[in-house]
Amino acid sequence: MTIPLISGLGAIADKYDAILCDVWGVLHNGKAGYPAVADALAKFRAKGGTVLLLSNAPRPSTQLPKMLESLGITHGAYDDILTSGDATKTFITTHQLGTKYYSIGPGRDNNLFDDTGVQQVSAEDAEFIVVTGPFNDEEEGPEDYREPFKPLVARGLTMVCANPDIIVERGDKHIYCAGALARLYEEMGGKVIYFGKPHGPIYDVARAKLAGLRGRAVEDARILAVGDGIATDIKGAAGAGLDALFITGGIAAAHVGDHAEAPDQARVIEYCEKAGLKPIGAAARLTW
């Protein structure tokens, strides 16, 4: 297997009409934005390309522009945003699992449930569970939830996972996401419904959004997925039949080089081979 190290987006931009770009780990690290990434995406758009930010954020996409702006990422870097929170909210609104839910996650995610017609209740009264992350992601991990999960699994409650990510960066620290809790719930015998990367439905919605933005459908061969998560961004792109550019300076940095900004090609290849995936290339950061 050969996975080239790409010098910049400009070297491959002509092959694509649209980019599905991850947010956390590519555009920012949770505390600071990467200005060169925003510049690269803006240049792609200036050449006629379309950029759809595809995020596993467990909140509506309407919340992200303000957050991105605070990190120095302006709207000039993208055309639109699609989040796993959008897909989760759409599903919850159907009331397929009922109208009474038990929420696991920080209070900042509560607006996910606005205008959905569902009611937050105690674990004992719930008809289903929604997980957006640990209650305190600075300190908690999945094992903190093993005991609380036991009665929920025993009752057969379905868990809706609004963010399939296992971990993300926050500054120089790794924190657990909803996907880590959902994985444990499944391992304990519980049923989980996932929304977001790497699961197929989010890519169908993304294709439809791209078609709306460009006025016509975009061929899969002309769509490039960009992300730092091998198990979400790169795996999801492969499952959807899309090319993927692997950003190694995010959560995989320690696995593929001694320095985040200088990936070792042999280690990148080994890391991807272990995952059974072959992105079209890799780069420490997305630059032009």
Predicted regions and their residues:
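Asp-based, Mg2+/Mn2+-dependent phosphohydrolase catalytic module
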Residues: 2-23, 28-47, 54-82, 86-288
